[in-house]
Regions:
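Glycine/proline-rich, flexible active-site/cofactor-binding loop segments
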Residues: 93, 99-159
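Domain-level detector of nuclease and nuclease-like folds
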Residues: 148-264
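N-terminal module-boundary/linker segments of secreted carbohydrate-active enzymes
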Residues: 76-114, 120-123, 247-251, 258-264
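Acidic, turn/loop-rich segments in luminal/extracellular domains of secretory-pathway
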Residues: 1-75
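A short acidic/small-residue loop/turn micro-motif
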Residues: 45-48, 123-124, 164
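A generic structural motif
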Residues: 71, 120-122, 163
């Protein structure tokens, strides 16, 4: 197993011998050679600790330089399911879940005064109806009205107050499936990610409430013509973020795939 994580390059103009050392929060997990190669002392365990923060110190005994480094571990998945590389594992149903602290929504990542909720409302607005244009608040920070299609219930909505932003893989479902082990920064990104197209979708409040935190073994959209697209989104998210698929979930998804002639 390869334990090295990075190689630090430094030069001294006078040709003096450089000395490397580590400090910070987690130096005991690593070693660094005279050539600047940083490696784990022991094979790390993803579920025990997967974020490490260290300071790299370089000195010629006259001048010293310190550089921070954060090392993240990624979960390795090796199971194959319907063309996706995934993790087969049962849900962790005993791990504590605190949505408000671990997965706060909705952030304003680009500083334009629009939270990510309103970014999604803007991006998913259907601009084909002059009677229902996209209307913002006077300060431009909030979407008030427009036109949105809920593929779960096959319905249109025209007021943003009737529309909710659904995490296709609900936060509690993601948490039980492995997101519980994400570092805090990754939990925050997962809860607010508008860059991964499949993760968030604007739907009616009633369909979102009906779904709750269910996986496909307990809930599917009322609109059966959307089954295949929904399942593909689900699998894309589970694969991309290395979230596990439990046995009941896999069985139902496979049956639905076959019954509806889905293609990935």
């Amino acid at each position: 197993m390869q334990l090295s994580v990075a190689t630090i390059s430094a030069n001294d103009n006078d040709g003096d011998l450089l000395q490397y050392s580590l400090s910070g929060n987690d130096p005991s997990y690593f070693s660094i050679t005279n050539q600047g190669v940083i490696a784990f002392n022991q094979p790390p365990s993803y579920f025990e600790k997967n974020e490490f923060s260290i300071l790299i110190n370089v000195t010629d005994n006259i001048v010293s330089i310190t550089q921070p480094l954060t090392v993240f571990l990624l979960r390795v998945c090796s199971d194959s399911f319907l063309g996706k590389i995934v993790c087969f594992e049962e849900e962790n149903t005993i791990i504590e879940y605190d949505r408000s602290n671990d997965y706060p929504t909705w952030q304003d990542w680009d500083g334009d005064c629009q939270s990510n909720r309103h970014e999604v409302l803007e991006s998913e607005h259907i601009d084909d109806d002059s009677n229902h244009p996209l209307v913002f608040s006077s300060d431009g920070c909030f979407v008030n009205s427009g036109k949105w299609f809920d593929p779960y219930d096959n319905l249109y909505y025209f007021s943003s107050s009737e529309v909710q932003i659904d995490h296709v893989v609900a936060l509690f479902e993601a948490h039980k499936s492995g997101a519980w082990s994400f570092p805090a920064s990754r939990k925050l990104k997962f809860a607010n990610n508008i860059d991964f197209d499949d993760l968030l979708i604007a739907v009616g409040g009633s369909s979102n409430a009906s779904k709750g935190s269910s996986d496909p073994s307990d809930w599917m959209p009322n609109n059966s013509s959307y089954y295949c697209e929904y399942l593909n989104k689900w699998l894309n998210i589970k694969s991309e973020f290395r979230l596990s698929l439990d046995s009941d979930e896999r069985e139902v998804i496979l049956n639905l795939y076959q019954e509806n002639n889905c293609q990935n």
